[in-house]
Amino acid sequence: MKLRIIWLGKTRDPWIKQGVTEYSGRIERYLPLAIDELKDEKDATLEEGRRREGERLLKQLSPNAVLVALDERGQQLDSVKFAEFIGKHRDSGTTELVFAIGGSYGFSDEVRSRAGKVLALSAMTFTHQMVRPFLLEQIYRACTILNNEPYHH
C-alpha cells in the first residue's frame, strides 16, 4: 500500500519542515510515501476558496484512492485504533491511502463527500501547518505499533 499526504499551501516554518523531513524518512522504512503540496487560495471568499482548493485536491486522486480528510470535527482515534485503521487498509488490499490536510478555508462539501473517513487528531484546534508533522508522527507511530516495535509504550 502506498501512503500519500496532500496539503494545501507551502510549509513555511523551519521547525515544521524539519519535523516533516524527519518523520517522512522514518515512515518510508515501512511504506512508500508521497507528499504533495498544492497551491492554496489567498484572495478568495471562504466558499470560493474551499471550492477551488477542493477541486484542486480532488483532481489529484486516483479513482481507487481511499481519502481520509483531517478536520477538527472528525472522528478521534487513539494511536492504537489509528494503527488498526491503517493496518486494515494495508491488509485489505487498499492500493493508496491518502490523507488530506486542508488549508485555512477548510474542506469543501465535495471533498467531505469523497472522503471515506474524516479524522481529527485532537479535540484541540491546530493550524494546518502544525498538523503536518503531527500527522506524520502518528503515521510513524502506527507503523511501529503494527510491527510490534517499542516506540509506542
Curated annotation (Swiss-Prot):
Signal peptide: none annotated. The gene is rlmH. S-adenosyl-L-methionine binds at L70, G102, L121, S122, A123, M124, T125, F126. This is Ribosomal RNA large subunit methyltransferase H. It is an enzyme of class 2 (transferase). Homodimer. It catalyses: pseudouridine(1915) in 23S rRNA + S-adenosyl-L-methionine = N(3)-methylpseudouridine(1915) in 23S rRNA + S-adenosyl-L-homocysteine + H(+). It holds the Pfam family SPOUT_MTase. Specifically methylates the pseudouridine at position 1915 (m3Psi1915) in 23S rRNA. Keywords: Cytoplasm, Methyltransferase, rRNA processing, S-adenosyl-L-methionine, Transferase. Its main location: cytoplasm. It comes from Trichlorobacter lovleyi (strain ATCC BAA-1151 / DSM 17278 / SZ) (Geobacter lovleyi). Gene3D superfamilies: 3.40.1280.10. PANTHER family: METHYLTRANSFERASE, RIBOSOMAL RNA LARGE SUBUNIT METHYLTRANSFERASE H. Belongs to the RNA methyltransferase RlmH family.
